[in-house]
Amino acid sequence: MAPAAASGGSSLPSGFSVFTTFPDLLFIFEFIFGGLVWILIASSLVPIPLVQGWVMFVSVFCFMATTALLVLYIIGAHGGENSWVTLDAAYHCIAALFYLSASVLEALATIGMQEGYTYKQYHENISAVVFSYVATLLYVVHAVFSLIRWKSS
């Protein structure tokens, strides 16, 4: 019974169908916006390292994990097994929670940077906050639809 469920519409895509199915299409946008977050924070020279260290960890970790999952899905490493659907749902739920915490901390750090930091650092961190919240939204949407797929598998 399990192989029939795995071969249904609720299984993970493989090959280039990853780029045409929802929510897996969101991998591309998570990759782009997550990459922008850590690039912007790194280019601002991490003025508040205690807070922004967590933001950097979350953004780089999620960037690398998203890239790894995307490559594994493209090469079809999951083989249609339900355990990969569970992994996908768990990863995106954890990533959404991590990104939410990182976004709040980055916004707090940026508010505190209004005075005493360069104009360039301040504006790079404003951009990082915006992209961090966009990445959070993408991971939340992906998590919700991954949980729906997990429940139906």
Curated annotation (Swiss-Prot):
Where would you find this protein in the cell? Answer: Membrane
Modification after translation is described as: Lipoprotein.
In this entry, the parts of the chain located on the Extracellular side of the membrane are: 47-53, 115-125
UniProt topology in membrane: Multi-pass membrane protein
InterPro entries annotated for this entry? MAL, Marvel, MARVEL-CKLF_proteins
- Keyword list, A-Z: Lipoprotein, Membrane, Transmembrane, Transmembrane helix
- Which residues are in the MARVEL domain? 18-151
In the UniProt record, does the keyword Membrane occur?
yes
Transmembrane region(s):
25-46, 54-75, 93-114, 126-147
Q: Which GO terms of the molecular function aspect are on file?
A: structural constituent of myelin sheath
Q: Name one GO biological process term.
A: myelination
A GO term from the CC aspect: membrane raft
One family name in Pfam for this protein: MARVEL
Q: Which residues lie on this side of the membrane: Cytoplasmic?
A: 1-24, 76-92, 148-153
| Purpose | Could be an important component in vesicular trafficking cycling between the Golgi complex and the apical plasma membrane. Could be involved in myelin biogenesis and/or myelin function.
| Family that this chain belongs to | Belongs to the MAL family.
Name of the protein described by the UniProt record: Myelin and lymphocyte protein
Instruction: Name its species.
Output: Canis lupus familiaris
Q: Which gene encodes it?
A: MAL
